């Protein structure tokens, strides 16, 4: 028994040594092939002068202007001339020309990639300009891809820029992806993220994926190395990391949650860096470079953390041997990404009687005393359920701030200690509103008119409508409608 164990150990050691030798030979072959490529590209030609003398002039693999432009990065040992030639031959696709796509495209174009494709169906808005650094005020209203390419051509005219002025669809994605070597996911919604990852896996393209919200960001290099479907040695895909999409109502956009420009810029720059590494580095060894998730938090120490990711899932819907997602299901539309990720809906939709437009609110509750001697309605209470940071930006006169997050974190209905006790109301509810003597109407307002409906339901569950004797409703359309109907100077953010 002991001899068998020794034999097994010896065989394992020999296998390990042989594999190490093989890896070294592969590396030597790669270096030799690179040297041969440089020699093939650095040819000579004979020029005959007027006096009949001949001179040999060397033709260099890069243009003279390119040596000057890229010289500072070419002297970096990890890049070199061969790395620059690989960049020039590379075809990179960026999906999304926003906060992530702009800095990623900026640095990839500056680095000298040969072809840069940009996919985005949106147009430039003023609210984009603080973070989407390729766009300018004069390009508001134009397609983002056109605005971005205009800037990039000024930066570096050598690459070929290809615009795709539309949002990515399952039917069109394979036809676009097939022409590129690597893909960058710079989008901001789960459905598109799954689509990009699936297409990249099915076509064997490495994928650099990033996201950013508020002051935090995440980065992953997926499907790297890009092995065929069913090959467990390939890098994991987006579905391997997130087999189930997040609940639709939990997805927060930059418009709702906010974003700090340098945060999303950092993640976009890191995407460009990872893309350059994939393009210029030798073939990756999965065991030597395990996949990881990089987490960036601008207000934490340290700023960066790394979490190791698992390998490909054995039951993954796209990269396992039993995959249900194929190029055919993409093209025929049977893979429904919107259905898979779900659609965010209101938790509770109010009836028309529970809603009031800003115009009607002003008619019911004017500041001035009616000149016709008409009856003055009861003084309303306005509850603004936006988060405090938004309330501090702008608020309606005499409104009180009770954030929707605070309302939802409390019990939805009052509880009694005993049969004769008063209901136990939440701490955030002002005493004057909870008073049994108060019958003044309550109007709830938010940014767009969605959270206010949920808040009205909660307030009624707490009994603030006095069984229907007191009006509790929301201002329909929120402060966006207030700007449109009442005050055109109301801050729009």
Swiss-Prot record:
It is found in: Cytoplasm, Cytosol. InterPro entries: MOCS3/Uba4, Rhodanese-like_dom, Rhodanese-like_dom_sf, ThiF/MoeB/HesA, ThiF_NAD_FAD-bd, Ubiquitin-activating_enz. Its EC number is 2.7.7.80, 2.8.1.11. Zn(2+) binds at residues 237, 240, 316, 319. Its cofactor is Zn(2+). One of its GO terms (molecular function) is AMPylase activity. Binds 1 zinc ion per subunit. ATP binds at residues 99, 120, 127-131, 144, 188-189. GO terms for biological process: cell budding; cellular response to oxidative stress; invasive growth in response to glucose limitation; Mo-molybdopterin cofactor biosynthetic process; protein urmylation; regulation of pseudohyphal growth; tRNA wobble position uridine thiolation. Plays a central role in 2-thiolation of mcm(5)S(2)U at tRNA wobble positions of cytosolic tRNA(Lys), tRNA(Glu) and tRNA(Gln). Also essential during biosynthesis of the molybdenum cofactor. Acts by mediating the C-terminal thiocarboxylation of sulfur carriers urm1 and mocs2a. Its N-terminus first activates urm1 and mocs2a as acyl-adenylates (-COAMP), then the persulfide sulfur on the catalytic cysteine is transferred to urm1 and mocs2a to form thiocarboxylation (-COSH) of their C-terminus. This is Adenylyltransferase and sulfurtransferase uba4. It comes from Aspergillus fumigatus (strain CBS 144.89 / FGSC A1163 / CEA10).
């Amino acid at each position: 028994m002991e001899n068998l164990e020794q034999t097994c150990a010896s065989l394992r050691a020999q296998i390990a040594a042989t594999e190490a030798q093989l890896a070294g030979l592969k590396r030597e072959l790669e270096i030799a092939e690179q040297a041969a490529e440089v020699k093939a590209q650095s040819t000579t030609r004979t020029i005959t002068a007027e006096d009949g003398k001949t001179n040999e002039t060397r033709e260099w693999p890069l243009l003279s202007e390119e040596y000057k432009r890229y010289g500072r990065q070419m002297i970096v040992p990890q890049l070199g001339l061969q790395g620059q030639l690989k960049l020039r031959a590379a075809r990179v696709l960026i999906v999304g020309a926003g906060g992530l796509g702009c800095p990623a495209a900026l640095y990839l174009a500056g680095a000298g990639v040969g072809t840069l494709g940009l996919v985005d169906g949106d147009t430039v808005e003023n609210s984009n300009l603080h973070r989407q650094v390729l766009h300018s005020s004069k390009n508001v209203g134009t397609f983002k891809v056109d605005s971005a390419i205009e800037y990039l051509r000024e930066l570096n005219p050598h690459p070929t820029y290809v615009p795709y002025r539309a949002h990515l669809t399952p039917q069109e994605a394979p036809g676009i992806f097939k022409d590129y070597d690597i893909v960058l996911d710079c989008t901001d919604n789960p459905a598109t993220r799954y689509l990009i990852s699936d297409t990249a896996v099915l076509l064997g393209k490495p994928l650099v994926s990033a996201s950013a919200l508020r002051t935090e960001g995440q980065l992953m290099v997926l499907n790297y190395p890009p092995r065929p479907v069913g090959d467990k040695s390939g890098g994991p895909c987006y579905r391997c990391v997130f087999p189930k999409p997040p609940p639709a109502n939990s997805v927060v956009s930059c418009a709702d949650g906010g974003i700090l420009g340098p945060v999303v810029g950092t993640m976009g720059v890191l995407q460009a860096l990872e893309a350059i590494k994939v393009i210029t580095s030798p073939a990756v060894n999965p065991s030597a470079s395990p996949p990881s998730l990089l987490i960036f938090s601008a207000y934490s120490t340290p700023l960066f953390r790394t979490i190791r990711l698992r390998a490909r899932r054995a039951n993954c819907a796209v990269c396992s041997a039993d995959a249900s997602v194929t190029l055919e299901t993409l093209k025929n539309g049977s893979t429904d990404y919107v259905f898979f990720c779900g659609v965010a809906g209101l938790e509770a939709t109010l009836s028309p009687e529970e809603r009031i437009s800003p115009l009607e609110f002003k008619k019911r509750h004017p500041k001035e005393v009616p000149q016709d001697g008409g009856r003055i309605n009861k003084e309303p209470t306005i509850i603004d359920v936006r988060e405090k940071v938004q309330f501090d930006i702008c608020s309606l006169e005499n409104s009180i701030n009770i954030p929707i997050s605070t309302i939802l974190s409390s019990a939805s209905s009052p509880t009694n200690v005993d049969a004769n006790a008063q209901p136990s109301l939440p701490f955030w509810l002002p005493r004057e509103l909870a008073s049994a003597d108060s019958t003044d109407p309550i109007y709830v307002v938010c940014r767009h008119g969605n959270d206010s409906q949920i808040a009205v339901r909660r307030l009624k569950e707490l009994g603030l409508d006095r069984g229907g004797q007191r009006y509790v409703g929301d201002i329909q359309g929120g402060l966006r409608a207030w700007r449109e109907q009442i005050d055109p100077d109301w801050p729009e953010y």
